[in-house]
Amino acid sequence: MFQHISGVINDETKRLRFQVEKVLQMSMFDRQKATLKMKEIDANELISGVINTFALKVERYNGKITSNLEAADPVIFADEMHLTNVIFNLMDNAVKYKKAEEDLELKVRTWNESGKLMISIQDNGIGIKKENLKKIFEKFYRVHTGNLHDVKGFGLGLAYVRKIILDHKGTIRAESDL
C-alpha cells in the first residue's frame, strides 16, 4: 500500500509540473501551435500510469476502472506531457460528471485500426445533450448542469484536449446516449 501511495505522490508531482506547463501553453493557445516535445511513447504504458494515479480517486466514489489496452502497436510519436494531460483530463471529467446515484464505471481501451492507434475513454456519467455535444471542445464553453454538480472551471479543459490532439495530427470526438 505504501509503495502504491508513494507512486501516486510521485505521479501527482509530475502531473503538477505538467499542469504548470499546460497553463503556460494555454497562454499561447490562440497564437500558434503548442510547443511539442515529440518522442516515441508507448501509449499503453502512459495510459496505465494515468490509470494507476486515478485508481484511488475512483475508489473514493465506489467506482472502478476497467482497462483493455489491446493495441498491439502502442508506440506513437507524441509529446508525453501533453498526451498524459489529455488522458488525465478526460478521465477527470468522468469523475467530475458522474451520476450521484450510481457508482462510477470508467472504461479505457486502446486498439489499432487502419495503422492508427485508437484510444477510447467511456463512462456512465450524466451525459451531454446533442445540442451541447458539438460545442464541448470550444474554448470557454461549459455545459450548464444547474446545481447538480459543483464543478469549477473555465471551459478550457476540453479545448486544450482538442488542440493537443489536433496538433498531434489526430482526431477526437465525443458521444452521448442523451
Residue ranges and their predicted role:
Residues D11-L16:
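Short alpha-helical segment of the dimerization/phosphotransfer core of two-component systems
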Residues R31-L36, V75-A78:
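Conserved micro-motifs of the catalytic ATP-binding
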Residues K37-D42, E59, K64-P74:
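Conserved catalytic submotifs in the C-terminal HATPase_c
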Residues A94-V95:
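Short helix-loop "hinge" at the ATP-lid/N-box region of the Bergerat-fold HATPase_c
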Residues D103-G115:
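Short beta-strand/loop element within the Bergerat-fold HATPase_c
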Residues I128-F140:
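Short conserved segment of the HATPase_c
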